[in-house]
Amino acid sequence: SIDRKTIKNNDMQSFHYILRSLLHSKGSNLLKVVSLGLGLTMSILLFSRVAFEQSYDTCFKDYDRLYQVWTQFTINGEKLDWQQQNSGPVAGAIFESFPEQVESATCTNRWMASDPLYYGNTRFDEPKIAADSLFFQTMGIEVLTGNPVQDLQQPNVIYLCETLARRMFGGEDPIGKVISYNYQRDLTVRGTYADLPDNTTVKADAVISLPPSWAVEVSNYSWDGGDSYPQYI
């Protein structure tokens, strides 16, 4: 039989041989190690990016039941391309016409909320959206404070995401604070909501009320054109 001393000597010889081989071709081995490390790093980054893209809009509650409304216009018998901008009343009409199939619907607008916000002399350029009173209910966004179904029916009301509210007011209670929309009109903070991630098509750090009565005054909120409203059901 082979004693332990012999086995130990054989192990040491093997280790010594491996070490000599590595030192003999250390340049080649270093290149292999670096290449392997870079390959693993790129693979991790690639898979992370794929996971990020594949999880778009999964931040919304019941995202698999949330749909964006698209419109296709026909002019003089010719069908135009599908577009994600709709006439103002479309989402509401779908909601009213299919009460058993549609639980909620909302109308939004970007350009009505495209100008900066100001609190005092400080400017805030975070992305914003104008939306009606069913926005949070339809999208399934967590509301932290406030009653958006009631509040967003009124003009000149704004809801802030948690991070933006903290940036603006620090540790102060944001409710009731008045901020300026590009020094054109004052907006009163009535509520806050949970931050939305970057991988969403509806990125908004602030939501400005979009009651139909106000939309009619500033834009074409009718069935006759005015197709500038992304909508969801």
Predicted features by range, described:
Residues 14-25:
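A short amphipathic helical element positioned immediately N-terminal to and/or at the very start
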Residues 46-114, 225-233:
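Membrane-proximal extracellular/periplasmic loop immediately following the first transmembrane helix
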Residues 1-11:
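Short, Lys/Arg-enriched N-terminal segments with co-localized hydrophobic residues
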Residues 35, 68-70, 106-107, 159, ...:
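Short beta-strand segments
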Residues 72-82, 106-134, 144-157, 182-184, ...:
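Short acidic/polar micro-motifs at solvent-exposed secondary-structure junctions
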Residues 132-145, 158-233:
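Mid-to-C-terminal secondary-structure elements
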Residues 24-54, 64:
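Short, strongly hydrophobic transmembrane alpha-helices
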